[in-house]
């Protein structure tokens, strides 16, 4: 054993990150047709032009909250990989229980 503790094989010494890509404006990757498809699935017939930016904003806030909670669960378990169960628990904590992904 190399003294790295539990689950420490092959993870290196954990030195400084060399490159961290700056992520910005990725919310525009949620395209107008994608939002339209979601609305159609929800039974919407006509969509105002202002809806697309509003939807992106709401989706961004929702995902930030879920991901923050999921990462908190991951860190508490001393893992580096966010699992499906972390996301399920994060959604449950927010009152949006999701079935079909274990647990």
From Swiss-Prot:
Return the InterPro entries for the record: CENP-T/H4_C (IPR035425), Histone-fold (IPR009072), Histone_H4 (IPR001951), Histone_H4_CS (IPR019809), TAF_TATA-bd_Histone-like_dom (IPR004823)
Instruction: Kindly list the places in or outside the cell where this protein is found, as annotated in its UniProt entry.
Output: Nucleus; Chromosome
SUPFAM superfamilies according to UniProt: Histone-fold
Q: Which residue intervals are annotated with compositional bias (Gly residues) in the record?
A: 1-14
Location (main, coarse): nucleus
In this chain, the stretch annotated as Disordered covers 1-20
A GO molecular function held by the record: protein heterodimerization activity
Sequence positions bearing N6-acetyllysine? 17
Q: Which UniProt keywords apply?
A: Acetylation, Chromosome, DNA-binding, Methylation, Nucleosome core, Nucleus
According to the UniProt record, list the residues that bear N6-acetyl-N6-methyllysine. Answer: 6, 13
Keyword Ribonucleoprotein on entry: no
Q: Pfam families per the record?
A: CENP-T_C (PF15511)
Which source organism does the UniProt entry give? Mytilus chilensis
Family named by the database record: Belongs to the histone H4 family.
Instruction: Indicate the quaternary assembly.
Output: The nucleosome is a histone octamer containing two molecules each of H2A, H2B, H3 and H4 assembled in one H3-H4 heterotetramer and two H2A-H2B heterodimers. The octamer wraps approximately 147 bp of DNA.
Protein name per UniProt: Histone H4
Source superkingdom? Eukaryota
GO terms for CC?
Answer: nucleosome; nucleus
Q: Which residues carry this modification: N-acetylserine?
A: 2
The residues that make up the annotated DNA-binding region are 17-21
């Amino acid at each position: 054993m190399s003294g790295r503790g539990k689950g420490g094989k092959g993870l290196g010494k954990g030195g400084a990150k060399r490159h961290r890509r700056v992520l910005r404006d990725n919310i525009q990757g949620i395209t107008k047709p994608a939002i339209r498809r979601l609305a159609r699935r929800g039974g919407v017939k006509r969509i105002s032009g202002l809806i697309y930016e509003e939807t992106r904003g709401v989706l961004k806030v929702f995902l930030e909250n879920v991901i923050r909670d999921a990462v908190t669960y991951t860190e508490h378990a001393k893992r580096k990989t966010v699992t499906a169960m972390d996301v399920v628990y994060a959604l449950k904590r927010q009152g949006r229980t999701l079935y079909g992904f274990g647990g």
